[in-house]
Swiss-Prot record:
The gene is rplM. It comes from the Bacteria. It comes from Roseobacter denitrificans (strain ATCC 33942 / OCh 114) (Erythrobacter sp. (strain OCh 114)). GO terms for cellular component: cytosolic large ribosomal subunit. Belongs to the universal ribosomal protein uL13 family. GO terms for molecular function: mRNA binding; structural constituent of ribosome. This is Large ribosomal subunit protein uL13. Residues 128-153 are annotated as: Disordered.
Length: 153
């Protein structure tokens, strides 16, 4: 029997909705990265974008364990003396709290051209509203998968 290698015609993408309220960030990002990549499917092909489209709501209510809220996120502007930093708490309370979730998922994917293509299948929203009702996404309950996935405030 030959090894199955998926072609674009073989791939069927589903829409998945995940509520991130009270979910631990790293565990959420790990589950989402697996779904985006398509590794949960028996027809997984490493060089193809065979994952699902994932919509995450309530990204501003994600939980961080330990002292990770006080850890800084650093970046460089490219100019001399352009090192910048913000704590994760500042980002979550700021204008774009969904960037914490997006960055966590991005860093759990391989750093190549395919992962940049895969990241276009991720949509993250800070509130509970999202414009993807027409796709009728299937709800994935991350909180019931494992008791360690949630943390109270």
């Amino acid at each position: 029997m030959k090894t199955f290698s998926a072609t674009p015609a073989d791939i069927d993408k589903k829409w998945i909705l995940i509520d991130a309220e009270g979910v631990v960030l790293g565990r959420l990002a790990s589950i989402v990265a697996t779904r985006l990549r398509g590794k949960h499917k028996p027809s997984f092909t490493p060089h193809m974008d065979c994952g699902d489209n994932v919509v995450i709501i309530n990204a501003d209510k994600v939980q961080l364990t330990g002292k990770k809220r006080e850890e800084s996120h650093y970046w460089h502007t490219g100019h001399p003396g352009g090192i910048k930093s913000r704590t994760k708490a500042q980002i979550l309370e700021g204008k774009h709290p969904e960037r914490i979730v997006t960055l966590a998922v991005k860093r759990m994917l391989p750093g190549n051209r395919l992962s940049r293509q895969i990241m276009t299948n991720l949509r993250v929203y800070a509130g509970s509203e999202h414009p993807h009702e027409a796709q009728s996404p299937e709800v994935l309950d991350v909180t019931s998968m494992n008791s360690k996935n949630t943390r109270s405030a």
